[in-house]
Structures are given as C-alpha cells and as structure tokens.
C-alpha cells in the first residue's frame, strides 16, 4: 500500500515593536535576565493589560501581505495552562475569532506553482524563557514574557518536506519584506512547529497527527519531516497504530523522540479575556495599512528580470532576502553590469555569509565598496582571482578595497616587458607543455597561464599573459 503525507505548519513570529504587547517594557533582545519586566508582564495581582495598537497594525500588515481576510471584529482569549515560564498561569491569545483568516502563499513546485492555504493568523503574548543551568534546578528569564507574537497556521495543504521548506522560505521572505518581524531563528524570533500524518493514497480521511518541536532551522524542519513520515509509514506497515503525541527532533541522532501526549483545545479551557475590549479594525484603517505595503518578493523578482536583465534563477535567489535585494539594487543602479553584481552576491558574498552565519547588514561592506572593487577589476588594477582575496579582507575588516590593494601590493602586473620576461622563464621551465601546445593541445596553454599566475602570485594580467604566451610560443 502506498502512503502520502499531510503536513501543516504553525509559525510563531515575534513582531518588531519597541514595546511589549500589553505593557511598555522593551522587547530588545539579549539584555540581562529579568531587566525588561514590570508588574503587568510578571502577572502580579491587580495589574491590567492594555493592547499595543502597533501589534494589531503589524498583524494586519502581515495578513494583507499573505492574502488574508481581515476581521472587522475579533477578541482576545485566555489560554489556561501551568508552566514556570508563564507567570499568570494563562496566556492571552486568540481562539475562535482570529484577526486574519483564509489567506494563502504560492510556492514553486516541479512543473509550476502550488497554493498553500493559511487558515488563520492570530496575535498573542510570548512566554518567558527557561534556562537549565546545572542540576539544582532551572532559572526563568521573563524578559521575553509579553513580547508580541503572530501565529501563522497553514492549512494541511503541504504534501512533502520539500514543499514545507519552500513554504517557510517564502513566508520568511514576506515577513521580512513587510518589516513586521526580523525572523531571526537563532534569536527565537521565528519558531516553527509542524503537524504531520500519513494516509493511504487516494483516501481523504486524515491520519493521526504528530506534532514536531525543537526545529531550529528550515533544513531541520525538512529533515525531521522526512524521518517522521518514514517512521509513521513503517509503524502502519508493521500493523501498529500511530499515537497522537508531541515529538522532539534530535538533530545529533537524526531522529524524532517522544516528548509528551498532545493536548487538545479543551485542555486549555479557553474563554474570552475579560480585561480587554474587542478589537475593531475599520475598512479605513485596513486601507491605510494596505497603502504602506512594500513591493513583494514575487513582484520584485519579475522587475529584476525585466529591468536589470537578470536570469530568473538569479532574480529568485536575490529577491528571497529583502536585505540582499536592497543591496543588489543599490549596486546595480550605479554599475554597468547587474549580472556581475549578482554573480558576486550569489558567489563570494553568499559563501562568506553562510560560513559566518551573518546577515548582509551585519558585515561592514557597503554597496559603494563592492562597486569600487568591481571597478578595480574593470580597470585592470587587479585580477578577478585577486579580487576575491581583497573581498574577503573587506568582509572581515571593513577596509576600503583600494587601501587593501596598496597595503598588500596586489596590483596587477600589466607591464609588458616584466610579464614577457616571466612568460619566457615559464616556457623555458616547462618544455613538455610547450611541446603539447605545439601539437595542438590547447589545454597546455591553460597550464602555462597557471604557471605564470603562480610565479606572479596571481598578479599577472590574464589577457596580457595569454597574448604574450601565444606570441612567444609561435616563434
């Protein structure tokens, strides 16, 4: 019997507001524990919450960008459960009347696009953070308690781990473009839970779902789903039954492990939050927010293809990150070849960003500095290979490319007399390659060019080197 997977994703994104959802405490990441708290976010008796208007605005902004229907009337609810990081013993969230619903994202799949439905987007407060240090107990940092979140719940329209990955990449891109969240998974401002079940192909009844947690990257989501789908199919094929539970992804072992039985909605005893008035979003306010929406990733991709002549692949990669797209556009509007700019962004720049785990705005290279480097190559001051060395130095030090070239003596050897002397020396030292070239083996010329580059530590002008080698070899 063949099985298919049914996958739904729940994404929590912290909103980029300066203050918390129900009080004036700062949302700044990385402060000393319990320094951004007050009686409201600590849940002390007698305190009352006041809803931050910016939270509603950002949630509506995300909802509009994700093609949702925005509710004119919604309310907050209490979700009751006990956990040390939840000071009030309930979380203020939304239950039956979410702020946004019935949206969608379109992702690229083999042979076209696929629409993934978004069931709902609701606003809620974050919990604190448990710190497990030593064996005597756990500590709680309440700085995060009350930080505003949106929870984006997809429909179970996702069929494969690859589709889940593509959905998350697209969703992150849209949230970054709308500037409602910075989506930094390493700081916990974007968190993903997945629900997955399997069923025989051709049936419509859903199987028993498993929730997966501890997913620290989109690749981890993909790997965990791949493992869990295989595990569930194996259980069913062996005549077993799937137990509804929450499982944890163990990155080191590459497996999912049982965590706890899954709660149902009734376990939380939801009821309307009595201390907050309902949320009213007028059509006028909706339209005001809609007018502030920026150009979205898909529209920007199409424009980059037509305006800058980029191949579709380049445009897709560059526009997947708003920061990368902005950097590219600043370069491309001041440099003669947008394609060369995209090659650098997708090549050396992307490699160093991946190696260091940094974002493009966290490194000291500006668009003007990259253009200056590219012009040094255009003007034959340095070669393309030396440019990569210079760029790496720029990446880590923020130094100007011209200064690096002068300090390290990296200027290209373009003096014909000096280069001809080196070319003759290389020809003399490599008689076999000379013989091969004269027999028609063009590869031998490449070897000789490489030897000249080695001799000059990469500083020989490649075009002039080629020309002089051909001249000397034809004698």
Swiss-Prot record:
Its EC number is 6.3.5.-. It catalyses: L-glutamyl-tRNA(Gln) + L-glutamine + ATP + H2O = L-glutaminyl-tRNA(Gln) + L-glutamate + ADP + phosphate + H(+); L-aspartyl-tRNA(Asn) + L-glutamine + ATP + H2O = L-asparaginyl-tRNA(Asn) + L-glutamate + ADP + phosphate + 2 H(+). Keywords: ATP-binding, Ligase, Nucleotide-binding, Protein biosynthesis. One of its GO terms (molecular function) is asparaginyl-tRNA synthase (glutamine-hydrolyzing) activity. Pfam families: GatB_N, GatB_Yqey. It is an enzyme of class 6 (ligase). GO terms for biological process: glutaminyl-tRNAGln biosynthesis via transamidation; translation. The keyword Repeat does not apply. The keyword Protein biosynthesis applies. It comes from the Bacteria. PROSITE patterns: GATB. Belongs to the GatB/GatE family. GatB subfamily. Heterotrimer of A, B and C subunits. Allows the formation of correctly charged Asn-tRNA(Asn) or Gln-tRNA(Gln) through the transamidation of misacylated Asp-tRNA(Asn) or Glu-tRNA(Gln) in organisms which lack either or both of asparaginyl-tRNA or glutaminyl-tRNA synthetases. The reaction takes place in the presence of glutamine and ATP through an activated phospho-Asp-tRNA(Asn) or phospho-Glu-tRNA(Gln). NCBIfam families: gatB, PRK05477.1-2, PRK05477.1-4, PRK05477.1-5. This is Aspartyl/glutamyl-tRNA(Asn/Gln) amidotransferase subunit B. It comes from Caldanaerobacter subterraneus subsp. tengcongensis (strain DSM 15242 / JCM 11007 / NBRC 100824 / MB4). The lineage of its organism: Bacteria, Bacillati, Bacillota, Clostridia, Thermoanaerobacterales.
